[in-house]
Each structure stands twice: as structure tokens, then as C-alpha cells.
Amino acid sequence: MEAAVFEKQNIQETVNELKSDAVKGLTDGEAFRRLQQNGRNEMKAARKKTKIQLFLEQLKDPLIYILLIAAVVSVFLGELSDAVIIGTVVVVNALVGILQEGKARKALEALKKLTSPQTIVIREGIRQEIPAAELVTGDLVDLEAGAQVPADIRLTRSSNLQVEESALTGESVPVEKDALFLADCRHEIPLAERVNMVYMSTVVTHGHGEGIVTATGMATEIGRIASMITDAEEEMTPLQKRLGDMGKLLSILSLGVCAALFLLAVFQHRNIPEMLLVAISLAVAAVPEGLPAVVTICLALSVTRMVKVHTIIRRLPSVETLGAVSVVCSDKTGTLTQNRLTVEKCWWYDVLEDAAGSNGRGESRCVQEMLRGMLLCNDASLQGEQRIGDPTELALLDFGEKMGMHRERLEKQYPRYDEKPFDSDRKMMTTYHRIPKNGGHKGSIAYTKGAPDVIVQHCTHILQDGRSVPMTAGQRKRISEVVELMNSLALRTLAAAQSGNTPGCGEEGMTFLGIVGMRDPARPEAEEAVEIFRRAGVSTVMITGDHVDTAYAIARQLGIAGHRSQCITGEELNHLDDASFARRIRNIRVYARVTPAQKVRIVKGLQQNGEIVAMTGDGVNDAPSLKAADIGVAMGTGVDVAKQAADMILTDDNFATIEKAIEEGRGVYENIRKSVIFLLSSNLGELMTMFVAVALGLASPLKSSHILWINLITDSLPALALGVDKNDGKSLMRCPPRKAAESLFARGGMACTLLYGALITGIGLAAFLVLPCGILAGRGELSWNLSDWVEGLRELLSREKILARSQTYAFTVLGMCQLYHAVGMRDMQKSVFAMRPWDNPLMVLACVIGFALQFAVTEVPFLIGAFGTSHLSGQEWLLLNVLAAFPLLAHELVVMLRK
């Protein structure tokens, strides 16, 4: 049956149609059978690209275009070996890109599985939490505020239920839902008007409901739309975009240098075909072939590593932003605290008692009524080892059981027939129950629980010795004093009240029943994390809905705030204009009793102050501030809406995990920065070695095949090793956060690139000229006159054997010096003797492979023929190794001078 018909059927007709039960749901066996028959409740994955499509995508790069042009020109000039090598390199580069992107894609797909939403389903009359993907048609689903609707559902029960359906209708105003609504059978009604239906991917913003699943997966309304949508472009990170722009710039510069050199050759009356080959070589030298692959694999591996420390990254750009975070705004409950609430104190009509001393003292009418209210006005459930619901409500159930009162029994005695769910504006929750009498029901009673300062405002009476008596001003003052006392002890407070009100009468004129104080101990590791943040230049700010005294007590214990003046309440915040708030914001460390709108204001105020803000949250009302923050951090136990709005999810709800994530973010950025500086300084050295030699009228020190070999073998492998290097976390977290717009070449990066580029240029030229200079010296023809010296070199390098050997020297030195250079680049602040090589086994492997292949290219006959190299003696290898080690010696000298 089409999903669009169910809004025209009453509840029983829908239940019969889907062979389900509106109270008990399906049996586990029937649910399993339907899952096997109809498949999982998931959107079909986008059609995967073919291997050919993936390969061609790798060629869509300006840097690759240069290599392809170089290959074509080489063919026209008769240099077939160079053309074959360039073509081979392009193919290998594309294949490596496909493999690495495949690895990145698999990592992200694994993360998607980790972030798949859960849902509450009722099967065989038992509420249980299952992955939304396992829902089947006919399942009875429980819907609460903050949940993402997991399938298309015909409502069977609704209580103040509102659903935001912008994902389907484009209308952002939540729609009031009504399970009893019945559409006119004679007319087709628009989706937005089907108020007895809720649809997959929409969001419950308010209230509570239950319903029968009518469609899953691609059969849902959103599934039909998804089947018509073409594949979306994959999101690129800001760093990837910047590196893409850098690639385009390098392409332009490369062509400019080639054109300049060609014009110079014409001016010098050089051989035109020969100079075309040189220009091709220069173009190749300017292309850092390994750069895109390094960045892709570095980010993907980082995301995979974060899973091991209980962090799920939902958006790749977040990895970069993490490293720049300067303020962490954290909720208190469950993040800075353990979220293991226990009732420690309770108060009823002037009796304040430790909960531990209340064991078995449920005989007092006041205690019974207060507990009855807190257990009935409660949506949590205890089912053996499975605890489902809000930690506050679970703590009340635990306390009730300790006192000999059980919610399930009370629910049978006082069945709930309506409710007003908790929301952040009212700060209360009310449920309406039938009163039992002589086997029947007489009248009704309403129980309300919420923040004591809010509840007391709605009360006119107080329960005294089992009777409801008018509340005096003195009693109101006493309640306020009890709340302050509990808050000063870092206890969360919750009050209960009762009334004879019906759902249409509001929540006024209630009778105050009592207060409980619950302790949520601070996480021991949170204090250490706050201190690490302080040393790292990252401020910690607590934002909570709790009372200011409770919040300050925890903040002081954790080292977030040292003085009461660093705290502000939502009410005080309302009285501050933007200018006053901007002046105070740097000193405020605790925000208490704040609304969702105020959270957004706090985030934006910090951002206007130049801060990069990470914000934690777990509720539906946290979604706006999570979206507003630079990094939205949702809790693993949070609602689906918060997770969808967040950039990052903490699966252990632990504040200390944020510190590990920021450390990882800083480390990833530093690794990419090291790789970029290494690759560009190496390519600059190759480019300038050739440019200077040719500008002097000499032959080219390197062939294009030599440069490609260096760039792919002795550049790309070490660059990849640098990209996955294990950083010193303690050192990283002793530095202030970088600015979000900071260039990769900031903090000495440009100087480092130019210094090592110049050094590699000198080494390359020295290696190229050492043989002809030696011959000139042996003849006694080494002249201090530059023109005579250049003329002598030019004459010697015109001889094929001398040129081949000189090019072999330059090729070998430039290839090996990249390996030495990479070892030093692991940590620009530390001596290589202070680094532990086995912390980066990939670097060890890259160096071993690099040296072995560089040796092979001058010793294996097939490779000698392909690359036009010469066999080297042991003495020559020793000399060239000394020259190649200069970048490492320079690194040690720089480190020594800094100290």
C-alpha cells in the first residue's frame, strides 16, 4: 500500500493493514522476518563510480596537465624514453590516488556507520533501543523531543507533539501533530497537512508520541526524493582548497619559468629542441606530484585515529578547525561531570534529610507524595541491566526503589492520560493521571517537576502533614534557602508539585511537595584537561542550565573559575547590551541558567572577539548553538538533532576527549604543514638547480625522467611519512592556538622553504659541477675568471660521457638529500638525535626504500638504460652521500643556534 493512503485510515485500520499491535508492537521473530524480506531501513548508496571514472578524475589537475604536455612534447622531439617514463608516472600517480582516496572513503563510510541513529521501539510490549536501520513496517516506535523521525510513521498517540518538516516541505515552523486526525478519503491532501503522519528525516521539536511504521528506506517520502537526486559533490576542506589554489599558482609559475628560460635560450642562440626538453624538465620540477595524495591520506588517517579516542568526526574540515580552537564552551552535566546522578538530600516541609538516612522511611505522607510525583512525572525506565532515559529521571527511579516505591506499579494505579513535556522555556514537565478508587477511577491529578525557583512561582500551597495548606512568604524564603544550601554543596536541585488541574487549565495554583538534591561528581580527568587547555592557550567556559551556585562549585573544583565574579546568569545576561557584554566576555567563565538563544549569543560574542569556539551539547535546544560554533561537539548519548547539527561526536561524553581531539587537530595541521614545506623546498631546489645551470649557458643537470623519479620516490614517500608522523602531544599543547586564517608558511615556514631550497640548489649544482671542475683543475685550467670558467665547463659538458656522469651525480645527490631532509623535517625544533626513529616506522621504511631504489637506478642495467645514468664506485657513493647529508647538518645547526 502507498504510504500516502495511511493518513486516510484510522488507527485500527492501519494496525490491521500492517498486521501489528498498537500496544505491544511486533514480535521479535516477525520483525526479523520482515527485515530479511524488505531489507534495512536505509537510503541506497549512490551509484559507485567505475574504475575508469575514478582514473580519469585523477587526471583533472593542472599539475597533471603539465606532465601530459611534457610527455607529448618529448614524443615530438624523439625522446621516447622520457615520454614513456612521464606517462608511466602519470598512470602510477593516478593509481596511487585511487588507492588512497579509496582508503579515505572507506574510513569515512565506517564513521557513517558509527553515527547511524538509534531509535526506541516497542516489541512484545517491551521498550528497547535499536539501530534505526533495523526498523521494519509495522514496528511501534516511541518518539520524543529531539529525536529524528526514523521512518514514515502513522501516529497512534500524540501529546503536544510538534515536528519540524523543513527537510521535506521547506517550512521551518514546527507542525502540530494529532494522532486522531483523519484525512478526507475523497481528496489527496498535501504532505504538510497530513498531521497524523510523521516522516523520515524530520525532527521532533516538542512533545511525545507513538506510531506504527508505514514505510522504510527508499519507500519513504524522503527516499523517493533521494532516488531523484544526482550525486552531491564531496566536500573539500579549506586546506585542500588552498592547496588546490597553490597547485594552480605553481602551474602558472612553472609555465612562466619555462617561457623565460626558452626566451633566454633563444637569446643565447642555444639548440631549440634541446631547450624544449630543458623547459619540459623545469615544468616537471615545479610539480609536487605527491602533495594532493599526502593531504588526502593524512586527513583520512587522522579521522580513523580519532575513533580510537572516542571521537567521531562528521565533517572533514573539522579536523583542521580543531587545531585552531581557542575557547571550549562545555555543558556541565555529563561532560565535565560523570552523569551518574544519585539523590543525596531531600527536603519536604521543613525537613532536610540525607537520602542515605531515608532508607525505608517512605511512611511519611509528604515523602510518599513527593516521590509519587517524581516517579509518575518521569519517562525513564529500568529493565534489568538496561537503563533507558534521562540520567536525572533514572536517579529518581533509583531513589524510589530504595524507598520501596516502583514506577511501574504506580503507573498501573495512576494511569497517565496526558502530559506536557519538559521544554527549556517552561523548565517544567507535567503529567496527568487518573485517581484510583474502589476499582474504578475518580477524577484526576497532575504532577509537575522542574527547577525549584520556577516551580515555586506556580505554587500557592505547600503539603504539610499530608494536607495542602496556603504557602506563606516565610515558607517561600525557606525553600529558597534550601535550594541555595544544596547548590553550594554542588547538588543539582529538582522540585515536585501537584494539582487537580486538567490539561486545559495550565500549571497554576499547585501544591509544593518537596525538593531533592542530586550529586553528579566531577570527572577526575576533566580537571587535568582544563589545566592542559590553560597551558595550550585554550580557555574553558561552562555553559549550563543549572543554578549558578551549583555551576560555580563544580567550576571552582575543576579550575575553570576562581572567583564568583566570573559567573553570570541568563537573567543578568539579558540586562547586558552587546557593548557591555563584549567588555565582560573575556572574564566570564561560567554561564548559568541560560536559554538556547543566549547560548547562541555567547558563541557569537566569543567569535566577534576573534575566538575559534568549540561548543558541546546534547539536547534539541543545543542544536542552534552547535551550528553557530566553529566546532559543534555532540554527546554520544545526545539526541539525533544535536548529532546532526554537530561537526564532531564524543562517544564517551567525556570532556577530556575534547583535549585529545584538539591535540590531534593540531598534530594533523603540523604534519600537513611539514609535508608541504618539505615538498616545496625540495622542488624549489630542483627547479633552481636547473635554472641557474641553464642560465649560465650550461647543459641541464637533470633529465625530466630524473626529476619525476626524485619527486615520486624520494619526495612523495617521505612526504607521506611526514604526514602521518607521531607528534609530541605535550609540545603541541604547550603552544597557543594558531589563527584560523594562518598561512602554511607562517611561523618561519617561508624562511624554512627558501633556506632549504637554496641549500638544495647549492648541493645539486656542486654535485653536477664537481666532475668537470675536477677535470679542469687536473689540467690546470681552472680559472677565477667567470666567463673562462663557464666556457671550460660548457665545453666539457658537451661531451656525452661527462654529461651523463655529471647528471648521474646531480640526480643521485638530489635524490638522497631529500631523504636526509625529510628526517630533519620531522621536528624543526628538535635535534635528530633526540627523535625516536621507531615512532615513525613509515619514515624508516621510506628511507630504506628510497636509498635502495636510488642505488638501483645507477647499478641495475635496465634502469641505467632507461634513465641514462652511469655506474658509481664506492668512493663516489661516499662523496655523494656526504654532499646529500648537508640538509640534515643544516637542520642540526639551526636547532643548535635556536638553543
Where are these regions (language model features)?
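Membrane-water interface at loop-to-transmembrane-helix junctions
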Residues: 738-759, 796-809
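Membrane-interfacial helical/loop segments at transmembrane boundaries in membrane proteins
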Residues: 774-801, 862-871
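Alpha-helical transmembrane segments and their membrane-interface junctions
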Residues: 758-774, 854-868
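Conserved cytosolic headpiece of P-type ATPases
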Residues: 1-736, 742-745, 811, 828-899
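Alpha-helical transmembrane segments and their immediate juxtamembrane interface regions
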Residues: 784-804, 812, 816, 887-894
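C-terminal substrate-binding/catalytic lobe of Rossmann-fold NAD(P)-dependent dehydrogenases
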Residues: 26, 767-770, 774, 803, ...
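Membrane-interface segments at transmembrane helix junctions and kinks
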Residues: 795-805, 873-882
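Generic alpha-helical transmembrane segments
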Residues: 714, 807-822
